[in-house]
Amino acid sequence: MSLSNKLSIEDVDLKGKRVLIRVDFNVPLDAEKKVTNPQRIAGAIPTIKYALDHGAKAVVLMSHLGRPDGKPNPKYSLKPVVPELEKLLGKKVTFAPDCVGPEVEEIVNKADNGEVILLENLRFHIEEEGKGTDAEGNKVKADKAKVEEFRKNLTKLGDVYINDAFGTAHRAHSSMVGIDLPVKAAGFLMKKELQYFAKVLESPQRPFLSILGGAKVSDKIQLIDNLLDKVNTLIVCGGMAFTFKKTLQNMPIGNSLFDEAGAKIVPDLVKKAEKNNVKLVLPVDFTIADKFDKDANTGYATDKDGIPDGWMGLDCGEESVKLFTQAINESQTILWNGPAGVFEFDKFAKGTKATLDACVKAAEEGRTVIIGGGDTATVAAKYGVEDKLSHVSTGGGASLELLEGKALPGVVALSERQ
């Protein structure tokens, strides 16, 4: 699956067409149904505006919100998104009460002069995800014939299909893979994600460093395994470093996280790193705590003595940060997935913040720094540096699967450049 060879919205003639765009408006709402973080809506605006500026007859937006499990639920209606979308777009938006059916088709077919229509939540229909729960809460599967019909009915709403929902690209849902139009192209958000991931996965500038943190080794085995074929240096930090330290160096880790399943694989991963000439960097000192709490008592431990019983490592120490910074400074391409400590607690955020500072400096010097979604994207947002890095991915699960070497159904479904 080549990432850099997909059709994008700029390659497509939109004049006089109904442009059906799969967006990701899965935004948080408060008790008053107000959007609390409009970032995802703002992210889709350039694609919508491009379609309007290039003569689209109508722009039809489809999205999911939350997990209604295949049945209508007013709590997950997309209607509260309308005022926020109108504000950001600077024009009126028509809300359709469903995402398929005669009433929706009539609204779409009457639309002209660049009218913008937002469809109701796709996941109110079990046919979007292919599964859901019934009224009693039992798991149910969608009927195959009905899924086909649902996809045909969505297809009726456009002449051109644009996918701008990278965060859902790893899901083979109807709106991602089932739209049967001759032209299926990436929107600007999707295009940027594909460009940057192509940069690291298909032709990285070397030396190439990957920083992997987070809790469990077993969750990241495929990721580590795939990246060991691509990187020059690998930093293992965060909770999963303790599984490496205990397994490889027999370091006492006290009550720190230990992943039994992951520990069995560690020697194989280290062998592969040696075989591929990949430099493995592990933390050498730790900020420790007497409990998992923001107000815990703190201490310091090195890997020489290990972590005493009754204490747990929640961050890496200054010597580790020096090693990480040196590796960052020596690299041209840096891919970061998973924090270096429990950054949610201020006492244990230093290692993550120092690593982030080194990454920002690298990006400012013109090197490529990519943050792979999820918790690490939250870190970049927490310290307000998203625009100081080359790319912060919007898709946690999707970026993880790409980096594991998997093909993403939503990307595979897009047309290739001729």
Swiss-Prot record:
<feature type="binding site">
    <location>
        <position position="216"/>
    </location>
    <ligand>
        <name>AMP</name>
    </ligand>
</feature>
<feature type="binding site">
    <location>
        <position position="24"/>
    </location>
    <ligand>
        <name>(2R)-3-phosphoglycerate</name>
    </ligand>
</feature>
<feature type="binding site">
    <location>
        <position position="40"/>
    </location>
    <ligand>
        <name>(2R)-3-phosphoglycerate</name>
    </ligand>
</feature>
<feature type="binding site">
    <location>
        <position position="23"/>
    </location>
    <ligand>
        <name>(2R)-3-phosphoglycerate</name>
    </ligand>
</feature>
<feature type="binding site">
    <location>
        <position position="171"/>
    </location>
    <ligand>
        <name>(2R)-3-phosphoglycerate</name>
    </ligand>
</feature>
<feature type="binding site">
    <location>
        <position position="220"/>
    </location>
    <ligand>
        <name>ATP</name>
    </ligand>
</feature>
<feature type="binding site">
    <location>
        <position position="64"/>
    </location>
    <ligand>
        <name>(2R)-3-phosphoglycerate</name>
    </ligand>
</feature>
<feature type="binding site">
    <location>
        <position position="170"/>
    </location>
    <ligand>
        <name>(2R)-3-phosphoglycerate</name>
    </ligand>
</feature>
<feature type="binding site">
    <location>
        <position position="338"/>
    </location>
    <ligand>
        <name>CDP</name>
    </ligand>
</feature>
<feature type="binding site">
    <location>
        <position position="239"/>
    </location>
    <ligand>
        <name>ATP</name>
    </ligand>
</feature>
<feature type="binding site">
    <location>
        <position position="376"/>
    </location>
    <ligand>
        <name>ATP</name>
    </ligand>
</feature>
<dbReference type="GO" id="GO:0006094">
    <property type="term" value="P:gluconeogenesis"/>
</dbReference>
<keyword id="KW-0460">Magnesium</keyword>
<keyword id="KW-0496">Mitochondrion</keyword>
<dbReference type="Pfam" id="PF00162">
    <property type="entry name" value="PGK"/>
</dbReference>
<feature type="binding site">
    <location>
        <position position="122"/>
    </location>
    <ligand>
        <name>(2R)-3-phosphoglycerate</name>
    </ligand>
</feature>
<feature type="binding site">
    <location>
        <position position="67"/>
    </location>
    <ligand>
        <name>(2R)-3-phosphoglycerate</name>
    </ligand>
</feature>
<dbReference type="GO" id="GO:0005524">
    <property type="term" value="F:ATP binding"/>
</dbReference>
<keyword id="KW-0808">Transferase</keyword>
<dbReference type="InterPro" id="IPR015824">
    <property type="entry name" value="Phosphoglycerate_kinase_N"/>
</dbReference>
<keyword id="KW-0479">Metal-binding</keyword>
<keyword id="KW-0324">Glycolysis</keyword>
<feature type="binding site">
    <location>
        <position position="238"/>
    </location>
    <ligand>
        <name>ADP</name>
    </ligand>
</feature>
<feature type="binding site">
    <location>
        <position position="219"/>
    </location>
    <ligand>
        <name>Mg(2+)</name>
    </ligand>
</feature>
<feature type="binding site">
    <location>
        <position position="239"/>
    </location>
    <ligand>
        <name>AMP</name>
    </ligand>
</feature>
<feature type="binding site">
    <location>
        <position position="375"/>
    </location>
    <ligand>
        <name>ATP</name>
    </ligand>
</feature>
<keyword id="KW-0067">ATP-binding</keyword>
<feature type="binding site">
    <location>
        <position position="214"/>
    </location>
    <ligand>
        <name>CDP</name>
    </ligand>
</feature>
<dbReference type="GO" id="GO:0046872">
    <property type="term" value="F:metal ion binding"/>
</dbReference>
<feature type="binding site">
    <location>
        <position position="375"/>
    </location>
    <ligand>
        <name>Mg(2+)</name>
    </ligand>
</feature>
<feature type="binding site">
    <location>
        <position position="25"/>
    </location>
    <ligand>
        <name>(2R)-3-phosphoglycerate</name>
    </ligand>
</feature>
<dbReference type="InterPro" id="IPR036043">
    <property type="entry name" value="Phosphoglycerate_kinase_sf"/>
</dbReference>
<dbReference type="GO" id="GO:0006096">
    <property type="term" value="P:glycolytic process"/>
</dbReference>
<dbReference type="GO" id="GO:0043531">
    <property type="term" value="F:ADP binding"/>
</dbReference>
<dbReference type="InterPro" id="IPR001576">
    <property type="entry name" value="Phosphoglycerate_kinase"/>
</dbReference>
<feature type="binding site">
    <location>
        <position position="344"/>
    </location>
    <ligand>
        <name>ATP</name>
    </ligand>
</feature>
<keyword id="KW-0547">Nucleotide-binding</keyword>
<feature type="binding site">
    <location>
        <position position="39"/>
    </location>
    <ligand>
        <name>(2R)-3-phosphoglycerate</name>
    </ligand>
</feature>
<feature type="binding site">
    <location>
        <position position="313"/>
    </location>
    <ligand>
        <name>AMP</name>
    </ligand>
</feature>
<feature type="binding site">
    <location>
        <position position="340"/>
    </location>
    <ligand>
        <name>CDP</name>
    </ligand>
</feature>
<feature type="binding site">
    <location>
        <position position="343"/>
    </location>
    <ligand>
        <name>CDP</name>
    </ligand>
</feature>
<feature type="binding site">
    <location>
        <position position="123"/>
    </location>
    <ligand>
        <name>(2R)-3-phosphoglycerate</name>
    </ligand>
</feature>
